[in-house]
Amino acid sequence: LIEAGIHAWENDYDIKLRNKRGKFKKPVGFWLPEMAVNQITLNVLAKKGIHFVFLRREQIEAGEEASIYEIETDTQPIYAFVTDTEISNAISGGTQTKDAEDFYRRHQSLIDNRSRPPMLANDLETIDHHHPMMRFFFNYLFRNIFGGDNNPDNRFTRGTAMIKRGKVIDNTSWTCPHGLGRWTGENGCQCHAGGGIDDHTIKDRKDHYMLLRSYLDNVVNRLHVAAGERNWQMPFTRWLVEQHKNLSCGWRISLASVDASFQSLFKELLINIAGLQSCGWYFGKESNLERDIPQGCLQALRLKTTPTGPIEGGS
């Protein structure tokens, strides 16, 4: 699936950055989904040539503060860029991002009162998607406030001086230190998607999650039975790569290249992945479209057919 993601990245952005031999320069970093991460996740990423990920400080076990942590894996070290949760979230999900100077005043203590430079991490959909004109906000913030003539004491520094050793805390998420405990009630999570979510919604999310996990276990078991001695994982990954354009454009998926004994099961597995990886578990108001994705996937699985529209959500 990581290989499928790299292939999709090349297709999406029509990457023309090539090395001297004319080959694609593959991405070396990975923005993890909202799902929980553990050491196994990092082992797989490192084995596939990924060198760094973004994590929150709450996800790292370490004796020293740093901006970057080196985490051992089965093959090679992987580096975790530790982002500052409060200020990063204020940019991604806050409403006070129309005035850069006002934003800085509101969060100055988060920026100034620390022994290391703040590290902000925001996915690209933040810019001009969640917040129109966000690129101008960033432009002004960094050029006129964080650096430049107005603040001659602000300087960029080499990150290597900030690297310390650490370990990932299993089953945590960059959106919540409790991972899916936000909806399942595990790990004593009280985050509730940023607050303001009632008990009914929490129960609804938990029920959806448990049902999707049940469907996932069921379809994987049936795939093992249908495959017998055959390997179904690699054919599924290849098919997923083939369908990337259809999925990203909202077109119907094609099962023409899939063995007849796998077609229905591959379709169910794809819908399950969309439901379990959806941002809808974590973000948006109750009326937000993203909240409907897990429920829509459950409905499609119950009908054992694909939705009439595009399969949305997830990573």
Where in this protein do the model-derived segments appear?
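Catalytic domains of cell-wall/extracellular-matrix polysaccharide-remodeling enzymes
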Residues: 14-63, 126-141
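CE4/NodB-like, metal-dependent polysaccharide N-deacetylase domain
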Residues: 2-32, 108-121
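Acidic, His- and aromatic-enriched active-site or binding-groove loops in soluble protein domains
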Residues: 3, 11, 15, 46-82, ...
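Active-site and substrate-binding clefts of carbohydrate-active enzymes
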Residues: 65-315
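Surface-exposed charge patches
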Residues: 7, 43, 274
